Amino acid sequence: MDMENNLQDLKKKFNDIERNLENPTNLSQKEFITLSKEYSELRPIIKIIDEYNTLKEEISDLEEIMKDENSEGDIKELAKEEFFEKHKVLLPKIKAKLKLALLPKDEDDSRNAILEIRAGTGGEEAALFAAMLFRMYQKYAERRNWKFEPISISNTGIGGYKEASALINGTEVFARLKFESGVHRVQRVPETESSGRLHTSAATVAILPEVEEVDFKIEEKDLRIDVYRSSGPGGQSVNTTDSAVRVTHLPTGIVVIQQDEKSQHKNKAKALKVLRARLYEIERQKKEMERSTMRKSQIGSGDRSERIRTYNFPQSRITDHRINLTSHRLEQIIKEGELDEFIEALISRNEAERLAGES
């Protein structure tokens, strides 16, 4: 009965919001934006509620036909078959769909994301793998019509990336990419390997929700900002002005270096954006750890030390170890960014775990 009351309350809330938005003259701009956001979030849930209520009415009508002594035998039989289909098959499905829609949303899912990739163990091979992953996510962003804006790239000079970061803007970026955080491992024969021996190397991926200054404030007194001349591969100076910026967050010791832009002001803004995202993610992880004491997630917490996926080139195979999903479409995934098979499976597993945790 509680669920029925909740559905009625949601429906009433939605109708009230709809009425307010139809007469926006009484609303401030801030109120209008807030209500519009609520409306767009509630609309898909209301659609499922309407489907659920319609189905219940149809089931009730069929019950009446089955009970009616004046109904003909053939009509009763048809009603019985339809009742079974709707009551035993469709109703449980729509109830599950409704429960999922009513689960509390991750407030960060609608945010843009900052992608950070660092070469791990494996020397130059790891750096080449890091560059490959960076391009893979860039391709995936293109497939989804997201904007992919590189923030910083530290080249090795021969095609590899020691580390690289990018800001990804678009719809549900963090929601779809958040399970990519962790250690990605590659197994392949390097082009420089004359004996044909298989090498294993790794790169670390971090997906951070982008946060604006109004959402997460950093105290000026907690920052040390150093400026210096930017340098390229091998350490040679590539700029004649002090445009490179190093921002140190004193309480945590986190350091962000930004030197890709020629303007010191732009480098500082980018460095602060990355720092804000990293600090926000630390807070996020704390909250997630508190929640995970009640609900152990099988697909991982986004811990960057957790090995999540292996890319095996000789066998053209990619395996996600959290959900035991293997694909032999390595080339399409790496070169074309066809990641949806893994991303959809991870989202589905997470939803199933959340539903199980609520029951």
Curated annotation (Swiss-Prot):
InterPro entries: PCRF, Pep_chain_release_fac_I, Pep_chain_release_fac_I_sf, Prokaryotic/Mito_RF, RF-1. The gene is prfA. It is found in: Cytoplasm. Residues 286-305 are annotated as: Disordered. Keywords: Cytoplasm, Methylation, Protein biosynthesis. Peptide chain release factor 1 directs the termination of translation in response to the peptide chain termination codons UAG and UAA. It comes from the Bacteria. This is Peptide chain release factor 1. PROSITE patterns: RF_PROK_I. Methylated by PrmC. Methylation increases the termination efficiency of RF1. It comes from Wolbachia pipientis wMel. SUPFAM superfamilies: Release factor. The keyword Zinc does not apply. The lineage of its organism: Bacteria, Pseudomonadati, Pseudomonadota, Alphaproteobacteria, Rickettsiales.
